[in-house]
A protein has these predicted regions:
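Glycine-rich phosphate-binding loops of nucleotide-dependent enzymes
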Residues: 1-185
């Protein structure tokens, strides 16, 4: 997979672009296709089923659910139980802290651990492309480096990453391509 980063000033439309691709925002005009199939008019679960998943800004974990339950929610569109278990094992291998804390409530995790959980939950859907919105926001420098290493690993594993990130230097250092959004119009 490739890593493509969108950079630009606040209000340029980076997050809106990701939300629109994910089906959370309806565009005023234009079209969105993925692997030759139109995404406009599809429900979010249909979009996830086609291999597109979003790791939202601010992580958005389900605080009152366990780490394991959060991860299982990422596979809600999948029906292949054995494959889901194999994916869960791969997620635990990539994020050992999540396995150690699988019965812990997600709301009690640190910011970096919550980001790992959000990324792991996205990987549970077995995506072809992950839309990542500000994954390093609010994290300590050690977690930022770890998150960017994981993004690179995900890409090397064959999944494309569309990355929105304020840390332009770090994002461009791992990106195969970078695009600048100038205005929000």
């Amino acid at each position: 997979g490739k890593i493509v980063t969108l950079i630009g000033s606040n209000g340029a439309g980076k997050s809106t672009t990701l939300k629109t691709i994910a089906g959370l925002v309806k565009p005023k005009s234009g079209s969105i296709t993925f692997n030759g199939e139109p995404l406009l008019g599809k429900s979010t679960d249909q979009i996830v089923s086609r291999g597109v998943t979003l790791v939202p800004e601010g992580r958005r974990v389900f605080a009152q659910l366990s780490v394991l339950d959060n991860l299982k929610l990422g596979a809600f569109t999948r029906k292949d139980k054995e494959e889901i278990e194999e994916t869960l094992l791969r997620v635990y291998k990539r994020f050992p802290r999540l396995e150690e804390r699988k019965n812990q409530m997600a709301g009690t995790l640190s910011g970096g651990e919550q980001q790992m959980l959000a990324m792991g939950r996205a990987l549970m859907s077995h995506p072809k492309i992950i839309l990542m919105d500000e994954p390093s926001m609010g994290l300590s420098p050690i977690f930022v480096s770890e998150i960017f290493d994981i993004i690179r690993e995900v890409s090397e594993g064959g999944t494309t990453v569309l990355l929105v990130e304020q840390n332009a230097k770090k994002a461009l250092s791992i990106a195969d391509r970078g695009y600048v959004l100038e205005t929000g119009n």
